Amino acid sequence: MIGNLDNDSMIADLGCGCGSQPIQLALHCQAKVKALALFPLFIDKLMDRCLKSGVADKVEGIVGDMCSLPFDKESLDVIWSEGAIYNIGFKRGITEWREYLKSGGFLVVSESSWLTDTRPEEIEQFWNEAYPEIDTIANKVQQLSDAGYQDIRTFVLSSECWIENFYLPQKDAQRLFLERYPDNKTAAELVAIQRHEAKLYSRYSDYYGYVFYVARLS
């Protein structure tokens, strides 16, 4: 989907956390990667993983805010944001970030989206409260087009991907979290919310999911 990247190309991964996506980008693309996260601890962990993976020379960890990017205008060949654009909002992100892309540069983001035009009231109410910007794929594509992007492509992540990479690892994290904060009401409420969300996904995964949007700036 994205071609013509070379050793001088630059990819910015916004909201990278300490995850694996900057490493995978560095391994599979010739371009260099600027990985941005809000917390220094995330960047420290990421760069340690990059060193162990042999890509520390291709990845630059940056502590920064996706609401105020520390990049020059029209300096990036690709903006990548996996499961993070919701922090700023889809419409705001695709609009504000475009000025950092070179002409013909690519935007690649994943976003929670409705997979159907209608859905049960329980899951619609949950998501409209949790993330009011959730919308159908068709409407998200239209928003990208209205913001000046073209050649828009989409693909839906499988439910197995969401379960195996998010909800299952979350179970171990929840257990450790509750062991660390026993008899803590706030901790218990947080875990209860997460477990409720997981149950909703197991019940309603046909109606929503994570969708990748790949678009080229006009």
PLM regions: where:
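Conserved alpha-helix/loop element of class I SAM-dependent methyltransferases that forms part
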Residues: M1-N7
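Class I SAM-dependent methyltransferase SAM/SAH-binding core
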Residues: A12, C18-S68
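A short acidic, Gly/Pro-enriched loop at the edge of an enzyme's catalytic core
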Residues: C67-V78
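A short glycine-rich, Lys/Arg-flanked "PGG" loop and its adjoining helix->strand segment in the class I
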Residues: R92-F106
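A short SAM/SAH-binding and catalytic strip from SAM-dependent methyltransferases
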Residues: V78-K91
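Short, glycine-/aromatic-enriched active-site segment of Class I SAM-dependent methyltransferases
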Residues: S112-Y131
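Conserved Class I S-adenosyl-L-methionine
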Residues: R153-S218
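Short alpha-helix
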Residues: E133-G148
